[in-house]
Amino acid sequence: MRRSVMTMALVVLVTVFSSPFSWSAETIKVGFDIPLTGDIPQVGESSKYAAEMLKEQINGAGGVSVGDKTYQLEFIYEDNESKAESATAAALKLITQDQVLAVIGPQASKQAVPAGEICNSFKTPMISPWSTNPQTTLDRPYVFRACFLDPFQGPVAANFVTQEFGAKKAAVLYDIASDYPKGLAEYFKAAFEKIHGPGSVVAFETFTTKDRDFSAQLTNIVKSGADILFLPQYYDEVPLVVKQAQELGWKKPIMGSDSWGSAELMKLCGEACYGYFFSTHYAAAGAEGATKEFIDQYNSKYGYVPDDVAALTWDATRLLLDAIKNTNGLTGNIEKDRDAIKDQLGKIKDFEGITGKMTFTPEGDPTKCAVIVKISDKGEFEFFKSVCP
């Protein structure tokens, strides 16, 4: 797949550099590479809803002032179908055909890692709101993110289950074919065994994307004597695993990760997920200030509480707009303007996001805190504690 993507990129590269590289001076165009269909369409919906709400708010107030000129925002949404190859194709279209100044997304690491390669190759700023895999930004000066990384999230989960449940033995179940759960599972295992010693992860079970029967792996986990099950899977897969585990006799805690944090989780899982915990980026219940304003506005407009993807998309888009403002003026030359935006993104410090304060490292990753959420007996995501670097 990598060879075909790079071949496609080279073909487009020839086309791009044979045409004028300028953009409309009347609107600021931003591309969104998001999953509107496929395995995780709720992620795409949340992303688009948050972006549209922000765009309407800014355009309604007159637009974005950059230097001595004011621009309206134009957002272009491309469906990456929750697939890596579609994400790269979407990035190429946004960059070369739509000639956006920057790209927001993809969200999931499986799509963000390859799309990041394309954006960096074309020197186009990209901000992934939700991708926690280090490979997304590694050695890619044009690629940023609005969330913490898995090398931080893995130890957060390992320390939490140790302190909260007194866990001395852990089991892990994850999709070996997907970048996000595979990476996070490995970081959790390393952190847990650093605390409790080699072999304390007594079951390290895998499956592959689209599997629906986990009975063999879960039987091994139940028999392993583990005190905790770590399940770093997406919200659409979690209910299947949880219900099958409970049917096989699992009565101990299950710890999740930020990929649990979708409103869709409780529709699919219901009471089976009550009482479980997961690490994430923000908690809607009990929010205050600008975060509460965002939640109330989103809930009023769309009829449900925004998940972490919506909140992170809001923050990622605002980060981009701040960087654009900080250029102090756009030239109309898309290469120069993309470079200027990239440079300003790297300089952002103490950005007050609704998911927390952020300062970018030289790698394009924000230094920020994680939140531990408990799923209440009402099915709500309740703030439990905050964990900072």
Located regions from the model:
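C-terminal segment of classical bacterial N-terminal signal peptides
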Residues: 15-23
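Extracytosolic ligand-binding ectodomains
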Residues: 2-4, 8-11, 23-389
